[in-house]
Amino acid sequence: MMFTFIFHIFNGFFHCFFKIFYFIFRFYRANLFFLWLYFLHLVMGNIVKVVTIHIHIRASLIIPPMASITKRHNVQYLILYKLLEKAIVFFSYTKKKKHKAPITLNFEEARKEYV
């Protein structure tokens, strides 16, 4: 919990930092560089958020639901976790087959076959 709190503070700080620098240097050649830095900051922020959500899900599965904030929170995390799991299976299926997967994909079959 402390890690996510500190991360959100730093993420907000860097978000404002890159916005200000992009505004200052938008008329110079450096604007593309700052735009790429800002994009990288957003991507890394989202990756860390997904990882922290994954850690929270694992913790909520181990710790009883009463130890968490609310049961509704756990359900939201579990739904997100299941969606991420299905996306990983789907993309691993498309990557290993070297062609686009069929629209009606049975995730259980793909999991047995490729995971």
From Swiss-Prot:
It is found in: Membrane. GO terms for cellular component: membrane. The chain crosses the membrane at residues 5-25, 33-53. Keywords: Membrane, Transmembrane, Transmembrane helix. It comes from the Eukaryota. It is a multi-pass membrane protein. Partially overlaps GNP1. This is Putative uncharacterized protein YDR509W. It comes from Saccharomyces cerevisiae (strain ATCC 204508 / S288c). The lineage of its organism: Eukaryota, Fungi, Dikarya, Ascomycota, Saccharomycotina.
